[in-house]
Amino acid sequence: MSDSLHTPEEPRPGPGEQLAHAHDGSLRHTRAKGEPRFPDGPKADPAGSHFERRIRSFQPRRSRVTAGQADALQRLWPKWGLDIDGHALDLTELFGNTHPVVLEIGFGMGEATARMAAEDPDTGILAVDVHTPGQGNLLNLADQHGLTNIRVANGDAIILLREMLPPDSLDGLRVYFPDPWPKKRHHKRRLIQPEFLTLAATRLRPGALVHCATDWEPYAEQMLDVLTAHPDFENTQPTGGYAPRPGFRPLTRFEGQGLDKGHVVNDLLFRRVQPRDQHRDLPPSATEAD
């Protein structure tokens, strides 16, 4: 994929605002009071997950949305987007084929996701995030480059895994540059925890790959420890350490900036092993609050 998968500069409306022409012919941003940000787009907290007493690994934030992103959310969400609302999901129906599907949790502005989709059109990517500009940008990139193997999911990935995806339905899990929650008191918010891996394992087919990447060394060490200790996964590296960056994971602009500053990026590549007990119970609602 060429370097054309970048976000163009556009007028920047406020969160959920629409562009309108002012009397002087310039653009201004308006939204009626009480009007949803995107009537045909992603909903705020679609499954009501914030009423659950559970620690979360993400922090929703309101961000400015460009005109192009807003247009993509309105126009393409009914086609390629879905809200994580707790209802069972049929991946064959969602993608319109029986191709393998990988789950990507957290995709930023979506440029790396779009590149991977372009390089592997026979694999579906179910990309989850709560960042509205990124959702709109990824939809825009998919539309511009004819990438029909991307679906954008809005909401809590735990609910998606726990309530919406059937067992053994995923051929891979990708978690690239998750929030490291660097403060010690926030470490419990990190996504890669034993409870999360136990839940994810029930949705991953034997042989499916779990691929994580981070430039935060302490988090990389925790990921390596947790994945190594988990009985449902094995390290693909004979030495038992970090993996070289696989060719299918593109170098992102964010990652490039970090490398220029001397940051070290660690990739972890683990394989889902054949479960010893096919009837092992699902975990409770992953990472319960105290």
From Swiss-Prot:
Record: active site: 179
One Pfam family here: Methyltransf_4
Keywords attached to this entry: Methyltransferase, S-adenosyl-L-methionine, Transferase, tRNA processing
UniProt KW Membrane keyword: no
Single GO MF descriptor: tRNA (guanine(46)-N7)-methyltransferase activity
Annotated binding of S-adenosyl-L-methionine, by residue: 104, 129, 156, 179
Membrane-crossing segments per the record: none
Residue segments, region Disordered: 1-49
The protein's Enzyme Commission number: 2.1.1.33
Pathway as given in its UniProt record: tRNA modification; N(7)-methylguanine-tRNA biosynthesis
PROSITE patterns: SAM_MT_TRMB
Protein's UniProt keywords contain Transferase: yes
Residues that hold substrate according to the record: 183, 215, 252-255
Reaction equations catalysed: guanosine(46) in tRNA + S-adenosyl-L-methionine = N(7)-methylguanosine(46) in tRNA + S-adenosyl-L-homocysteine
GO cellular component assignments: tRNA methyltransferase complex
Stated family: Belongs to the class I-like SAM-binding methyltransferase superfamily. TrmB family.
Protein name according to UniProt: tRNA (guanine-N(7)-)-methyltransferase
The organism of origin for this protein: Streptomyces avermitilis (strain ATCC 31267 / DSM 46492 / JCM 5070 / NBRC 14893 / NCIMB 12804 / NRRL 8165 / MA-4680)
Lineage start: Bacteria, Bacillati, Actinomycetota, Actinomycetes, Kitasatosporales
